Amino acid sequence: MANRSGIYYWKCDRPDAFFAIRGQADNLELDNEIHDMVSTFFGEDVSVRKACGQGNHLTFLADHDGRTFFIRVENGSDGDDYMEVEASVLSSVKAIGIPAPEIFAVDSSRSKWPFAYQIMENMPYEDLNKLLRGGALDLQDIMFKLGAYVARWQELEFDGFGPFNTEKLRRHGLLEGLHKTYREYYFLNMAKHLDYLKKKPFLTK
């Protein structure tokens, strides 16, 4: 598995950022494996359907015992193992009163299934982008609330900087940044990113 020690920004620095959503829409073998994984978790056969989400992961919905669950799957070629970190972060912010979905299962080890996954609480609401385009969002109210949440989660303090260390989390249950200083993280891929912008050319001399 790959950690994120060489990553500054995921979509820029990941070797194959869109593997999971490119050419995977009709992968019957993968669909069957995901069905088996979800059914194993619930202890009985469960119907699983595509959620058609937008982003870097494959998404599914599963119904069990009168509830709908949201499934995220990461099967990229670089073996990213960050879903457990994401689950831990959600748990941490939820513990200080910030609304966050509950994670019922997470595993990015790929020891039993050939993908990382989360089984989480489903939020049965419209996509925010769709609501925004339809003029149905009170932006001033929402931005005020989001600002309050951001201020609150600043109460959480961790050692290190940059992406969290997944091995540290697995072995010791601690969230710790992969880099010792902010400078080390900030300049990690600066030269590569600037070179890319010059070649496009987005930046000129």
Give residue spans per PLM region:
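Helix-rich C-terminal or lid/interface subdomains of diverse kinases
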Residues: 4-11, 140-144, 184-188, 192, ...
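Juxta-kinase regulatory segment immediately upstream of eukaryotic protein kinase catalytic domains
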Residues: 2-46
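ATP-binding pocket architecture of kinase catalytic cores
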Residues: 49-169, 173
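Solvent-exposed, charged/polar functional surfaces in cytosolic regulatory/catalytic domains
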Residues: 37, 152, 192, 196
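Short, P/G- and charge-enriched loop/turn segments at secondary-structure junctions
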Residues: 47-49, 205
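Charge-dense, low-complexity intrinsically disordered segments
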Residues: 21-28, 32, 77-80, 133-140, ...
